[in-house]
Amino acid sequence: MSMKTKSLLIVALGVLSGNLSAKDYLLSTPNTSLLITANPGEKSKYQYYGSRISEKDIQGIYDSSLAFGVESYPVFGVNTAGERAMAVTHADGNMSLDLVVEEVKQYTTDEGEMMEIRMKDLVYPFALKQIFKAYKGTDIISTWVEVENNGKKPLTLYRFASAFFPVHRGDNWMTHFHGFWGAESTMDEEKLTNGQKVISNKDGLVNTESDNPS
């Protein structure tokens, strides 16, 4: 997967094309496709992102080594290895989450296509929606999550990423922006190497006056 394609992949993944069965959801741009499985009672998983595919190609993805099989929103709890998108402490002090798909909704708005994957914890009254919004006439999908604490007592969120996406080893590039007063939005492109890449600033609420990394 190359970050030099026309499709935006920070939290942007393609144009929603609809579910193919009870669990397969294919999102496509003119040049790329994203395949997600979201079967009720199971983990929601990314299965493929790369060159554009059609419905008839899906079985070939599963039969090959191309399928990701990676949770679309991994949380700290039962499985703790690897990077987690969310970590919480419940009112009783337990730090475990075990989210499974409850339902998936797709609908259209004036701005584009929407897909909501609602997940619930198997023990606690905790739910999460992973939302994808495909804007009309673009190659952009924004994605974010909404958290629901349906218990009577508060819980503490220690980590809450807006998105999680796996990147397979390869010739992958990242485009990002930085700057300072009078020279904002300077674009950089760099090849992704092993390890983590962190883009941040410490200016807090005044970050748009100087360095605003993205």
Where are these regions (language model features)?
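Hydrophobic h-region of N-terminal signal peptides that target proteins for export
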Residues: 12-20
